[in-house]
Each structure stands twice: as C-alpha cells, then as structure tokens.
Regions:
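Short, solvent-exposed secondary-structure boundary/capping segments
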Residues: 114-124, 229-230
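Arg/Lys-rich, positively charged N-terminal/basic patches that mediate binding to nucleic acids
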Residues: 1-45, 51-53, 140-190
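Active-site-adjacent substructure of cysteine-protease-like catalytic cores
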Residues: 49-101, 191-193, 200-204
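Flexible glycine-rich active-site/ligand-binding loops centered on an Asp-His dyad
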Residues: 119-153
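Enriched for short, Lys/Arg-rich terminal
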Residues: 217, 222-235
Length: 235
C-alpha cells in the first residue's frame, strides 16, 4: 500500500474559532466571510495569476482538529438525526482514513502585496487556522449537475431556530458593529442552524451553551421560542 506526503500551502482565517457551531457546508451562513493566506514558498503572485477570473474555488484542507481520533467505518450523520449509521464514504464526516476535506467557496478578491498573497473568500465552513493543501478553480460546466441525486442531503437544511438577544446584548452589539460589521447577523445565522448535537435537540428549556465566534464567547440559552443570546464576553 502506498503512502503520500503533502505540503501545506496556506492557512484559513475565519470567524469560527472552534469547530462547534461551524456550519456543515459553505453558504449556509452568508455573513461568514474569511481569508486564505498562502504561505512560503507558495505565497507568490505568479502562483495565483489568472485566478481572479474565477468566481468560486474548491479548497482542499485537513481536518486538523479531529484527525487524532482516527477513522471510523460507520458514522451517524446529523442530517439523519444522529441515530442512523452510514458508511463513512457515504458521508462528509471528518473521521476519515485520510482527514481531507473539500469546500466550495466564493472568491471575492485576490490580494497580492510583496510577500503576501491573500484570497478573500465568501461564506465558508472552516475553522480559523485550518491547514490548506490545495486550491482548484470551480468549473460550472463540469461540476454543476442539477439532476444529481444526494440521498439524505438532497437540499440544504432549513435554518430552524428563532434567535433573540437580551436588551444588554443588543446594546453591546450596536457598539461592536462598528468594528465587526454584520456581527449581529452573523451570530443570528450561526445559531439559527442549531449547532447542538442531534441528540440534544428537543431538550428542556433553560439549557445554556457557549461558542467562540470572532473575539467573543457567545452564550445563549434554550427557550420556548428558540435561542436567546444573554452574554457576549470578550476573549
């Protein structure tokens, strides 16, 4: 059996500082923009010449936060309620023999300055610090297949949770929006996806959660109406 070694070509900069609450696919949280910073020796303007003519990219990356857990032959996809097992190769699970992921993202801008090459990205589903091993332009004529079937994931999951904020948090957000544009919308879109583990859904009201987004620990509670954000703590 052959083995291969790959070099990291870049790193992701993202508002998601931990894997909890990262959307399961790009495009679900529209306000979650990020960047891909190429690293030496790949941070050359020549390496991205012509890339600006493409609207979207495939990013191939490493599941660096789960790779120590090894691979599993079967997993439980969240879209199936977290109870039904499927073969790992029939899912997008992180627990793969080779911890490689792929993400289709919008390319907003290519910025080259001296030894810096930065790709400005649209809505993404990657944790801050994610290692990138390759990028490829998206080719609509070959890769857009409207008639394809996709089993349990034929359509995007609905944003099912109503998200509200306490008066104190709303006051904080008004001030923070100057430095973090669309912060309120970002938090709302992330939590509306209901990032809780599938087995936690349907639990009693009052349960609290926290997630690290941007530079803040966002704390929220389960209510009869959905989720209520009650604290925004700088980190």
């Amino acid at each position: 059996m052959s083995s291969f070694q790959f070099e990291q070509i870049g790193v992701i900069r993202s508002p998601y500082k931990e894997k909890f609450a990262v959307p399961r696919q790009p495009g679900l949280v529209k306000s979650a923009n990020g960047e891909l910073h190429l690293i030496a020796p790949y941070n050359q303007a020549d390496a991205v010449r012509g890339l600006e003519a493409f609207s979207h990219l495939w990013i191939l990356f490493v599941f660096h936060q789960t790779m120590e857990g090894g691979w599993r032959p079967t997993v439980r996809p969240p879209r199936l309620g977290g109870n039904t097992r499927m073969g790992v190769f029939a899912t997008r699970s992180t627990f793969r023999p080779n911890p490689i992921g792929m993400s289709l993202v919008e390319l907003k801008e290519v910025v080259c300055h001296k030894d810096s090459v930065i790709l400005k990205l649209g809505s993404l589903d990657l944790v801050d610090g994610t290692p990138v091993v390759d990028i490829k332009p998206y080719l609509p004529f070959a890769e857009s297949l409207p008639d394809a079937s996709a089993s349990y994931a034929q359509s995007a999951p609905a944003a099912e949770m109503t998200v509200s904020f306490t008066a104190e948090v709303e006051k904080q957000l008004l001030t923070l929006e100057k430095r973090y544009p669309q912060l309120t919308l970002f938090i709302r879109e992330v939590l509306a996806q209901d990032p809780r583990p599938a087995y936690r859904k349907g639990e009693e009201t009052g349960k609290t959660y926290a997630v690290w987004l941007h530079d803040f620990n966002v704390r929220w509670r389960v209510t009869d109406a959905g989720f209520e954000v009650f604290a925004l703590e700088p980190r």
